[in-house]
């Protein structure tokens, strides 16, 4: 075995790429390391495409092995199971920038598997996974227009930071991942603390500039370790068939794309395509209908893009910077804690907000350590939203990705646990979809949170931008339709407040997207965002003054941390009795913070009263109403507070001589006692006769 190794410095870390030792039967295998975080990336491609396939079957599988962090998996089977949400998101992060780099017409199946085999808790594995994938594809021989570079950018104290550590990210105002080739940015994914447009654009440019060292290193690695490129040629088009289809369908498709209602437009497009196929079959019964479908799709794209470049109205009649009609409703469901219905044209989201206690928060145990999510956002995309039938069940990759994007857009304005001690779950049900449903989820979430009384810092709105570019001519589109997303060159989603951007996601399908074009898109998105925020604020401009009557109310009190064990009791007996008898949920923290949750105010008051009793200190000289719990020869033990007992000596029962304690006291008898002394060991000395004397004097 002769390993080929390439090492280079990248930000704070040394990156190492190695091949030739592990997984030698794959088309390519690279062991990629950044510090102590190491991933094994393998690539396998089929030399022949399956007959009849009309799409590119690329699969990216990202898997984190618990042994990488020196852990044994939990659960009964003690082995890794289905992909976690984090694994799904990173798989999408890798897939998005590499997919456009495969040539048009390439239909051979390709599978990329990334396995995390070692992890440094301060170095996230996603960036090195992207670098390793780029290197493996570069040396595999599979047609691929790489290399691809990747970088994470932070923003700390007004300075950009390349590949910040996990600790640095905790103080960073920005967490941005950018991937691209030597000449183009292809993908951006970010979360930010309402940063200005110029800072966000600067971070993209900075990240792309810094990753050139990666691209150069992979090119050198390929020169030394790369396999010969496959002998593959793109399928040629039949020029006569292209001309026939243009003559038969161009005018009809042009008319169909003037129909503004999506379902009616699709129906007419289907009519035009069916008539075209019928005419072609009449002249040539053996014609390949799959090729006809592909050429019709290309013609469709050309028709729509041509109209936009010529300055004609868009598919639904709008100008490039126009936003579709908005409808904003808050408080639409009677029993939810918060709800909103946000409609933008033919895209609609029904969003609900549910409040819970800290124990309702999501507990996540990953190879990067344990963490808790108090704010959850789940996105559902049922098939009826686009007028189709389909499987309904667990969320797919796309739904997980869109939900996380919306979460990033909102997270920056969420209150801290000290400000709002609730767990929050938001669910966005996409009930209609024609473009930008994730950004509709951002808007709907902002509204639902306010309706629920969650004190978010300010409203948040999201907008999806598009681009059509032909040569030096380009048009930036605001609030794109589904067709404009599919037929355009860029999908550019921006969420934010009036003050700045909270989330930015960008996927670019072509090269030649300049800094100037991105700047125009960001400025146009800002205008669209402010317009949407104005409409949203008319419906609900700030959070409700109070939470829903149906939501649990959390009351926070403080106790002496040394008294926590008294509230818990032996084996949890005291706190269990408290919760069962009052019907409340009680959570204790190490600093003495007690959170009591209940939708019944009287139950909360009773729980507080009992906790205060348990944690209160015994006062010398005070009279308590106690209960006799044990009788002995020399006196009786009386419980005066929960968990606190004292001794009434036989001499302190009565002014008269007491020969037998049982003649004066019995078990469970309630008596008034005065605290005479609490010694250094915490033992309490009580007196019944002194209490009676004091009460008599008071009378």
Swiss-Prot record:
GO terms for molecular function: 3'-5'-RNA exonuclease activity; magnesium ion binding; polyribonucleotide nucleotidyltransferase activity; RNA binding. InterPro entries: ExoRNase_PH_dom1, ExoRNase_PH_dom2, ExoRNase_PH_dom2_sf, KH_dom, KH_dom_type_1, KH_dom_type_1_sf, NA-bd_OB-fold, PNPase. Its main location: cytoplasm. Its EC number is 2.7.7.8. NCBIfam families: polynuc_phos, PRK11824.1. HAMAP family: PNPase. Component of the RNA degradosome, which is a multiprotein complex involved in RNA processing and mRNA degradation. This is Polyribonucleotide nucleotidyltransferase.
